[in-house]
């Protein structure tokens, strides 16, 4: 029996900076265990600040590409993780996914500040997303272990 990798979509409201950070951490922590896709509601070029703070964490996301929202709606995903600031942004609804999680994370592009202040915001966002990705991986491992114990 062929096992397919679970497909995970990280969907950021705003630009894809947060979803690219989440994708980078998931790939770093799990290798190719998941098929991972990033989407930002607002199309944007690569985000140098996100790449820079991820490089500080030892992860290169500069080569990651985002999928368009329209294309993501055509794909089946086992997990959809929306990343938005629930105080300022509406969490997208994704009705056709098996598992949907909503992560409340501020949009680093929507905060004030320049230079080092902005970089500090990106670092806090990076660290928060890292914790959430680690929890997702741990929860996924527990689900997989419980499936194996049933068999």
Give each language-model segment a name:
Residues 40, 84, 104-106:
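Residues at the C-termini of beta-strands that transition into short coil/loop
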Residues 14-16, 85-88:
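Short glycine-rich anion-binding loops that position phosphate/pyrophosphate groups of nucleotides
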Residues 1-71:
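Conserved active-site segments centered on acidic
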Residues 88-151:
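Phosphate-binding/catalytic loops
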Residues 74-76:
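Alpha-helix C-terminal capping/helix-to-coil transition sites in glycosyltransferase folds
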């Amino acid at each position: 029996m062929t096992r397919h990798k679970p497909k995970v979509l990280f969907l950021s409201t705003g630009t894809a900076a947060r979803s690219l950070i989440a994708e980078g951490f998931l790939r770093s922590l799990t290798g190719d265990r998941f098929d991972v896709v990033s989407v930002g509601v607002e199309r944007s070029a690569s985000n140098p600040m996100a790449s820079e703070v991820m490089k500080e964490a030892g992860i290169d996301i500069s080569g990651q590409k985002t999928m368009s929202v329209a294309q993501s709606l055509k794909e089946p995903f086992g997990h959809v993780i929306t990343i938005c600031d629930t105080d300022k942004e509406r969490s997208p609804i994704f009705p056709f996914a098996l598992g949907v999680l909503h992560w409340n994370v501020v949009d680093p592009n929507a905060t004030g500040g320049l230079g080092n202040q902005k970089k500090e915001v990106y670092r806090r966002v990076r660290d928060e997303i890292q914790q959430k990705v680690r929890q997702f991986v741990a929860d996924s491992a527990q689900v997989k272990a419980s499936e194996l114990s049933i068999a």
